[in-house]
Regions:
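Class I S-adenosyl-L-methionine-dependent methyltransferase module
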Residues: 55, 75, 100, 104, ...
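Non-catalytic accessory regions outside enzyme or core folds
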Residues: 1-54
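Class I SAM-dependent methyltransferase Rossmann-like catalytic core
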Residues: 37-123, 135-143
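A short SAM/SAH-binding and catalytic strip from SAM-dependent methyltransferases
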Residues: 259-272
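C-terminal substrate-binding/active-site "lid" region of AdoMet-derived donor-dependent transferases
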Residues: 269-318
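Short Lys/Arg-enriched helix C-cap and helix-to-coil transition segments
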Residues: 389-403
Length: 407
């Protein structure tokens, strides 16, 4: 039977670990009720807290501990029912935690990535740090459905519909969906890259999907099948230490391509000095850098987002300039195009383009999409169309609108 003397661990370490698990439970309540229950159970259990706190600090991450528990065989039952399994299986849980890492590889993050890649022309050599299994190195291979106000657009790969279908609500986008990038070279960097052709790595990748997220699991499995058909180069190493060599390899492999470095939700795992070193390298090395991170992970990006009026906890930036807000998994994207129009202004213009002029169904459609009476809708639209920003955005449409209004 596994026993532990609680007096061997400082109270501060127990409290630190308990607080970490409580914060996780609070933040992730909507994503996984089971993990919330387990996290709170551990946070209030002195014996399990002592066991968790014996792990190296980086291995105490709640999602890592809970995933290892599942893989070790703890059944998906309430914490009260499963507690004895946690205790009995702890040696296996700890062994897994010491050899594995949280390598969440969610293809849905390709939706904001595509928004940024749309601004880069020509062939692309894509390098991703924190690539895990490389599922987000293939944004050109997936089907996308973009839902905007009053319209929906589906974009297919060149060879037809993909088995991976990603859906995102997008605001502030223009008339056409983001273009598909021409990716001619791919490389991922990760401390412990996963090979989806190996059953053990594939099992771990799937285990990182939380219990209730069956739709997400389907996406990960389908994306892994695509990656397995043409595995990218995945280099084991630290992001800051390996990025220079990866860029050099990309320049040699694709000399005519634009090198794009992507860091989707990974810089938060580096300390502040390493983040700054990485950002400085990207700024000085003649590469394009796409960042998708929490608002304050790179403080100057967060400050720039404040100045631009970009809201939200996650910010998409290109070369250090914020271009959109997004949720952490790319399910909602609000684009700020720099035209002087707000995202909602752009959506108004594009809605009118799609539903030009008075029609029999216009009034009901306006109420459904904008929750406005038709008169109020046109008042708002007139105000937008008369602005210099709208004339810069689409002078032909603005002129046509003005001519129609005079009739």
């Amino acid at each position: 039977m596994l026993t532990i003397k609680l007096g061997n661990m400082a109270n501060s370490e127990r409290e630190r670990t308990a607080d970490w698990f409580r914060r996780f439970a609070s933040a992730e309540v909507a994503e996984s009720p089971r993990y919330r229950d387990w996290a709170l159970g551990i946070a209030n259990d002195d014996q399990l807290l002592a066991l968790v706190a014996r792990l190296p600090l980086s291995k105490r991450q709640p999602v890592l501990v809970l995933t290892c528990a599942r893989v070790a065989g703890v059944p998906l039952r309430s914490f009260e029912t499963a507690r004895d399994d946690f205790i009995a299986l702890w040696p296996a849980i700890a062994k897994l935690a010491k050899t594995r890492a949280t390598q969440t590889n969610d293809p849905r993050r390709c939706t904001p990535l595509l928004v940024a890649l749309d601004r880069i022309r020509g062939p692309i050599a894509l390098i991703e740090v924190g690539a895990s299994a490389g599922l987000t190195l293939f944004p050109d291979r997936y089907t996308y459905t973009w839902n905007a106000r009053g319209r929906s657009v589906t974009s297919l790969p060149a060879d037809g519909p993909s088995t991976v279908s990603l859906v995102a609500d997008i605001a502030g986008w223009g008339a056409n969906p983001p273009r598909r990038p021409n990716i001619v070279h791919r490389e991922g960097i990760d401390l412990s890259p996963l090979d989806v052709t190996k059953p053990s790595d594939r099992d771990w990748l799937e285990a990182l999907v939380w219990p209730e997220q069956s739709d997400r699991l389907d996406i990960v499995r389908a994306a892994a099948d695509i990656v397995a058909q043409s595995p990218p180069t995945l280099t084991a190493g630290d992001a800051v230490a390996e990025i220079r060599a990866a860029v050099a390899r990309a320049r040699k492999a694709a000399p005519n391509a634009t090198i794009v470095v992507s860091s989707p939700a990974v810089l938060v795992y580096l300390d502040r000095a390493e983040r700054e070193k990485f950002a400085t390298y990207c700024a000085r090395s003649k590469v394009r850098w796409i960042s998708l991170d929490g608002r304050r992970v790179i403080p100057r990006i967060g400050d720039a987002a404040d100045e631009l009026g970009i809201e939200g906890d996650f910010v998409l930036s290109l070369d250090g300039v914020p271009i959109a807000s997004t949720d952490p998994l790319g399910r909602q994207v609000t684009v700020h195009g720099g035209s002087g129009l707000s995202p909602e202004d752009v959506d108004f213009i594009e809605f009118e383009r799609e539903n030009w002029g008075p029609t029999r169904s216009k009034e009901s459609l306006v109420r459904k999409v904008w929750n406005l009476p038709l008169v109020r809708y046109y008042q708002r639209l007139y105000g937008i169309m008369e602005s210099p920003a709208a004339r810069r955005y689409d002078p032909i449409l603005v002129r046509s609108f003005a001519e129609t209004s005079e009739l």
